[in-house]
Amino acid sequence: VLREVEAVYAGDLDKARRGWWSGAIHPDPAAAGYAAEDVLIEVDGGEAPAWLVPAGGTARTWAIMVHGRGATRQEAIRAVGPALELGLTSLLVSYRNDGLAPSANDGRYGLGSTEWHDVDAAIEFALANGAEEIVLFGWSMGGAICLQTADLSRYRHLIRAMVLDAPVINWVNVLAHHAQLNRIPSLVGRYGQLMLGHPLGRRLTGLAAPVDLKAMDWVARAVEVRTPTLIIHSVDDEYVPYGPSTVLAERNAEMVTFETFNHARHTKEWNVDPERWESLVKAWLRPQLAPRLNPGQRQFGDAPAGG
């Protein structure tokens, strides 16, 4: 297969010896044609850089976009177009240990159990700058972070909806999947999971605090998801299996809408079919963002009661 190199944003291809496929095709919002501001969000340990893409006018609802593990905020640029069409200001955030935001003391990912605090700070930033409601977008581990935010944030009542792409719904499932891929004996894999969640495992894992994997099992906690959620997940995802997303949607059909893609690797659903991805997101979000009626309030044109 031959691919044309259209542009080099950084580095020297003559000296490159290795590379990888990324789903991000733009280095920043400006390269995608969006006017953006560089902003800093106060978080634990300092300031986290973010891109702010204003929708214009007085946008009441902001989309806060959370990239996945090992990725950067570039991953979220693909969602800015649909957000703007819906009148949403977009805030593409960084979080602890992602290489942009301040590192945590232990320098380790918390799999969502700690990173959600930085998204909470982003919500506070949005509210201080005119937002009244929030939509969360999350990719991969960013989806796990969004779920934790919707569960634990002091602003959770202001989170109108979530759009999750290839989210981690159950870390035990993902860790077991990777143990199998890497031919790690199941007993060793289970021991590793135990050490993640046990105080005595800190010396082995380097984590400042245990990670409560059960608290992040949204298959078991399916009925506790009370924020309308769209999950987009490829059946061919090689990194985060789509099975838990399916089960979550089945167990909480009232709140969770599930859309599958084919032939897309992890978080690359948009890359396989951007038109469908964007259409799904816009069609699902529009009714979620519609004005809420107060009890007894009639929409214009409704017949009066008893008429």
Each language-model region and where it sits:
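Short beta-strand/loop motif that positions the catalytic acidic residue
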Residues: E224-R226, I231-H233, D237
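Short, surface-exposed "cap/lid" segments of acyl-processing enzymes
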Residues: D44-P49, V53-R96, L100-P102
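Alpha/beta-hydrolase active-site loop
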Residues: R108-N129, V135
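Catalytic histidine-centered segment of alpha/beta-hydrolase-like enzymes
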Residues: A264-E278
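Hydrolase active-site cap/lid region
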Residues: D151-V211
